[in-house]
């Protein structure tokens, strides 16, 4: 993607960081997009209203294209840019960006409180990847004085689980890091699974880091509760009318780089998979716990502002 305007630098920088996973996690991605739109709006506020709107929409489309699976991106961009249709659009876009950032941080806090209610003293928790929301649940349970242990999967190929393990260890929590393929071996030691979410569909399916669906299947087989922590802006409104979520496939070089002799070996690297609703015990949102079958209600209630 080619960027020509110096004023577009903040959009370019944010796009590249999201695309290259320097900024990772749906919540962080959403806040980064809102912040970039705010800064860009301030830079181009000297333009007339029509030019301002066109430039903001262009910037929004660029950001959305960075990660096709992360529904937080289009939802956040649409939320912020809805200000273009209101009185004083320049001011409203900036205000709506701030509103989203503040509400997103508050959502993480509330998810922690609701989710911690499902964690019992003495529980061993399994988590996957590097989710702010899931980490908030675990930290809150620990802050409540519960004696807990956490197993983190390494989360190949980018090893985001290392980040989670370090974060929880620094917080004082007992942490064990395991390879992704060892989940079934250790499931007998696990009391509850808590993961994050990149998207929730209208029928309650979970789109999350590759490997999540296998963990859910193993947990279901072993009768271990499987919960996903998801802010309401991660619910995908267009799935209610049958739109499918595109699963991003990333560079094969993230997995392995072979010498020339083996260049013919194909490598597939999907970043996400889909966990069916039947394997999910509850979705932890900032408004409370809901069954996966209630996802359509969240979309209907909280996405009235998402217009085509």
Swiss-Prot record:
Gene3D superfamilies: translation initiation factor eif-2b, domain 1, Translation initiation factor eif-2b, domain 2. The keyword Isomerase applies. Its EC number is 5.3.1.29. Keywords: Carbohydrate metabolism, Isomerase. It catalyses: alpha-D-ribose 1,5-bisphosphate = D-ribulose 1,5-bisphosphate. GO terms for biological process: L-methionine salvage from methylthioadenosine; pentose catabolic process. It comes from the Archaea. This is Ribose 1,5-bisphosphate isomerase. Catalyzes the isomerization of ribose 1,5-bisphosphate (R15P) to ribulose 1,5-bisphosphate (RuBP), the CO(2) acceptor and substrate for RubisCO. Functions in an archaeal AMP degradation pathway, together with AMP phosphorylase and RubisCO. PANTHER family: METHYLTHIORIBOSE-1-PHOSPHATE ISOMERASE, RIBOSE 1,5-BISPHOSPHATE ISOMERASE. The lineage of its organism: Archaea, Methanobacteriati, Methanobacteriota, Methanomada group, Methanococci. GO terms for molecular function: ribose 1,5-bisphosphate isomerase activity; S-methyl-5-thioribose-1-phosphate isomerase activity. It is an enzyme of class 5 (isomerase). The active site is at 129 (proton acceptor), 198 (proton donor). Belongs to the eIF-2B alpha/beta/delta subunits family. R15P isomerase subfamily. Substrate binds at residues 24-27, 67, 208-209, 234. HAMAP family: R15P_isomerase. Reaction proceeds via a cis-phosphoenolate intermediate.
